Amino acid sequence: KPIKDSFLSTTEEELLVTDFEFSLMCLSEAFRRWIVSCTQQVGNAEFGLLDALVLHVVRFRETPKSISEISHFLSREDPSAVQYALRKLETAECVVKVAGLAKRETRYQVTEKGLEQTERYAEIRRDVLIRVLNSFTREPGYMEELMDKITVMAGVYDQAALRANHATRIKDKTSAKEN
């Protein structure tokens, strides 16, 4: 349902962007609920979204990952949050530290318990989510086209964030010089 009356929307174009952003917020929350709910079903009641995502990334391609690789893969600028999630995963015995190629490089890999839990997660995902998605995404290329559009929009929002940050810093410097 379009958001007709919003301080964010003074033109039709702005209205479309506002509606898109509200839809994106709903999608983001639904995605978070899905990941957390499915993760809890496999025995990780204490895990949040980032914990679950970090576990999946560590398992991805079955190779050990560094904190910077995990952060990059998740497009996170806060490695300390990833590090905290890894500590939780270590405590839960889902991941373990392994030596990296460089002397000071620490990497993480899934343990047998982490492997079992990610396998159960994948089974639930197949049985529930994939089945539902397949019921309305049978059109050839639908998911690929959707992924391409989401990737482009992620880039647009990343660029907008950089520009907003830069513009704010310039404005702050200008204001400081005037005073």
Model-derived segments and their meaning:
Residues 81-82:
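Helix-turn-helix DNA-binding helix
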Residues 88-144:
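Charged, amphipathic alpha-helical coiled-coil/dimerization segments
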Residues 23, 53-57, 116:
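Pre-recognition alpha-helix immediately N-terminal to the DNA-recognition helix
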Residues 85:
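Residues within the DNA-recognition helix of helix-turn-helix
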Residues 36-77:
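N-terminal helix-turn-helix DNA-binding core of bacterial DNA-binding proteins
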Residues 123-179:
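Terminal interaction helix/tail motif
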Residues 1-45, 94:
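N-terminal leader segment of winged-helix/HTH proteins
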